[in-house]
Amino acid sequence: MKLVMRILLTCFLLTTLVIKAEGQIHTNQPCTSNNTRCRTYCIKVHKINSGKCMNSKCVCHP
């Protein structure tokens, strides 16, 4: 029974992570709160029309 619960919990957590991650791309592009640079990067590289600096990395939002 414990194994079944563990499998279900793992599936639930993975699904939650996937849903949260969908719609934004966390890149390894370094940035210093310069959102303009991130927007340019997101448009050029990922064809996504907006991006912002979070935790010194660019995050692209469609």
From Swiss-Prot:
Q: Name one GO cellular component term.
A: extracellular region
Q: Which SUPFAM superfamilies is this protein grouped with? A: Scorpion toxin-like
PROSITE patterns to which the protein is assigned, alphabetical: SCORP_SHORT_TOXIN
Disulfide bond entries: C31-C53, C38-C58, C42-C60
The record comments on the domains as follows: Has the structural arrangement of an alpha-helix connected to a beta-sheet by disulfide bonds (CSalpha/beta).
Recorded family membership = Belongs to the short scorpion toxin superfamily. Potassium channel inhibitor family. Alpha-KTx 15 subfamily.
Protein name (Swiss-Prot/TrEMBL)? Potassium channel toxin alpha-KTx Ctri9577
- What is the organism of origin for this protein? Chaerilus tricostatus
**Upper taxonomic classification of the species?**
Eukaryota, Metazoa, Ecdysozoa, Arthropoda, Chelicerata
